[in-house]
Amino acid sequence: MSCCKGLTPQCVRVRLPRRPALSHPARLYSSSSSSNSHSSPSRPRLLSRPQPHNAILHLPRPNLGSGRYDRIPQARSSHHSSAPMTDLEQRIAAIPIERYRNFCVIAHVDHGKSTLSDRLLELTGTISASDENKQILDKLDVERERGITVKAQTCTMLYRYRGEDYLLHLVDTPGHVDFRAEVTRSYASCGGALLLVDASQGVQAQTVANFYLAFAEGLTLVPVVNKIDLPTADPERALKQLRDTFELDVNEDGTGAVLVSAKAGTNVEKVLPAVIEQIPHPTGDPNAPLRLLLVDSWYDTFRGVVLLVRIFNGTVRPGDNVVSLATGNRYTVGEVGIQYPHPTPQTALRPGQVGYLSFSPGMKRIQDAKIGDTFTFQGSEAVVEPYPGFEEPKPMVFVAAFPTDQSDYQRLADSITQLTLNDRSVTLQKDFSEALGAGWRLGFLGSLHCSVFQDRLRQEHGASIMLTEPAVPTKVQWRDGKSTIITNPTQFPDQSEYHGKIEGFYEPFVAATIAVPEEYLGRIIKLCEDSRGEQESIEFFGAQQVIVKYALPSMALVDDLFGKLKGASRGYATLDYEDAGWRRSELVKLNLLVNKVPVDAICRVVHTSQVERLGRKWVTKFKEHVDRQMFEVVIQAAVGKRIIARETIKPFRKDVTAKLHAADPSRRRKLLEKQKEGRKKLRAIGNVTIEHSSFQKFLER
């Protein structure tokens, strides 16, 4: 023990990096010398014994060099201790909340939101300008493939303006109406928004809808006209539409708005100064009890559920003990960080910031992360008022999904479950079909949402599914005052079976806003009238643009109304809609029968005006995909006991008279009668074999 000479026998100072038993003394004993002390969420045992900065632990002499302390877990930061900050965090910590700006980009689909976001990230140095960094915030393969934004994504930026650093938080939102819930949640973390308009297309349907959503939330709007470099661009017309439609203070000479080309980078440098000058900074008290809002969440295989949060009051650090005001569940914070643009751990999140946090041990169930929930420190529940939260999006389209091969059921079940963990707007329950076997009934926000889910399943998991025709929920009002919501068409009651017990049927309607050039207005009105729509208003603005509003049944939307609008207007019409409640309607259940046996996979609730058209379409199309049998196959479309349409598949012909002499008519007649009786008996007891591929081809649009 000569190396310890002069020390007291009770303890020794552990600074012996050369001793083999203490192979990582800096990591084990000095919280200040470990750069990763804030990102080790797995061992919470030292939280009750935080060490001061640059502390030297004194350990008993007899254990020195025994190897026992190699297993001591790394100390984690708590709200009582400090940890070394990176250069990035030191720069962030020096920025007061008055120089924070939280904003989002809202626009109609394909008006250039993601491209503008890329230019802003490049301008602030958050990403480098390269071809690999296109659509950097569109992280899903389906987003890059389709060129649309499906999931709202966030990013923190640092920007130098007039000699001072500003902390900017950007949210790139979806433009399609199916993902409206993503846009609404994004508003909760923002103080303003860039209202983006395509200079060649002008104000579109979803521009109108997004404006009123943002206006209702009290967001400050900064008008931006994009794509000014296109040959068809007309910025003056776009500015006039912004002024006339929304009463924004913009002029045709461009004052009051920012004219840019996000693709070419023209005038993009003027956007962020406009954000700083016009959008107000957030407010918050770092010394008040923690009050944070859960904006979004996703599932991580290693960390469990990761939360995207907006901090309103207080400061949250790794090691803090927090509680959910919605569920009462208690957690220990394991890691906090920002999206820059990828997850970047930090030692703290402060008021006004938007970032992510995970727990240690991790939150295991995505259902425990309730969007709109409020979290605070344990013990502060009584003094912190919860936020009202968000309205849960309601599925508008339901489909039955089945594996193309029943042997793949379990693998497909795992893939669907994993996707629904990160897309909570999808509802899922088990289903069974006599024709297609075991499957699921899935609920989606719209037809595009359903299509995107199917693409993600194929791209991310290599799995394919067979989907039935989309259906909307219907409501049955009983005479005893009760009501039932039907999402599975096979469960829709038949009037003949429940005669006198049903008061009426109801279907969901939407308030649709359609923007279209005036020259196509007549076609659009006819299409809406044919879809059982009721016109509510019509407004002409500008030289050529018209906005018409209709009350339309949701059934029209799943019947490819969007595609029909595009076809009737040569691609110029745009559609936006919102839920408009239930309306009484004449509804019936249309079944497809094969030899008088209903095929449960092909069943739909329709309006009485559509029964004949759809029934004839079904029997004609299904006949093309059913193989001939040894007996006659009758395909029928029926409502209750009433047959709407019929097609017949003739049996294979076997010449039983081939070996007979031509002069023996009685024998010929006898054999033909016997064959006829045999086919009749076979038809009565035989089952029609319909391959899965036949159903798949029939169900394809």
From Swiss-Prot:
Function description: Promotes mitochondrial protein synthesis. May act as a fidelity factor of the translation reaction, by catalyzing a one-codon backward translocation of tRNAs on improperly translocated ribosomes. Binds to mitochondrial ribosomes in a GTP-dependent manner.
Family statement: Belongs to the TRAFAC class translation factor GTPase superfamily. Classic translation factor GTPase family. LepA subfamily.
Designated gene of the protein: GUF1
Biased composition range(s): Low complexity: 23-50
A Pfam family it matches: EFG_C
CDD domains: EF4_II (cd03699), LepA (cd01890), lepA_C (cd03709)
EC numbers, comma separated: 3.6.5.-
Membrane keyword on record: yes
Primary location class: mitochondrion
GO biological process: positive regulation of translation; translation
GO molecular function per UniProt: GTP binding; GTPase activity; mitochondrial ribosome binding
Enzyme class: hydrolase
Cleaved signal peptide residues: none
Binding site for GTP: 107-114, 172-176, 226-229
Database matches in PANTHER family: TRANSLATION FACTOR GUF1, MITOCHONDRIAL (PTHR43512:SF7), TRANSLATION FACTOR GUF1-RELATED (PTHR43512)
NCBIfam families: lepA, small_GTP
Catalyzed reactions: GTP + H2O = GDP + phosphate + H(+)
UniProt-annotated stretches for the region Disordered: 23-85
Domain of life: Eukaryota
Taxonomic lineage of the native organism: Eukaryota, Fungi, Dikarya, Ascomycota, Pezizomycotina
Name by which UniProt lists this protein: Translation factor GUF1, mitochondrial
Entry's Gene Ontology cellular component terms: mitochondrial inner membrane; mitochondrial matrix
Locations listed in the record: Mitochondrion inner membrane
Transit peptide start-stop: 1-29
